[in-house]
Amino acid sequence: SRHTEIRRDDVEKVPELRVLTSSNESGVHIIADKTNRQFFVTGHSEYDRFTLKNEYFRDVEKGLKIDVPKHYFPYDDPSQPPHFIWRCHANLMFSNWLNYCVYQETPYDLNDLAPLNK
């Protein structure tokens, strides 16, 4: 994710898509099609506390030029144990998606489900 970027302007050029969440600092986070049948999530909400730390130090040890992940280590200091503040948000996002975009929109008889391709 740190080596790629999805530009909001590019997404907004596609009439079938809409940006659901984004920020000035981290960019586009969640994109959905207008039917709410397809979702695209950037970032790694599934990461545990130390995954990003392990990736960061792996790349540092390889001598790669890499920035310290913002807001991950206290005071952006890699010698400190990382924060772990996203788990509840990640679980809530998944639960809400499952409830509101899958269960509420899925017919009881799956034969009634419209195909994705028109």
Place the predicted regions along the sequence by residue.
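Pocket-forming structural segment of enzyme catalytic cores
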Residues: 1-51, 117
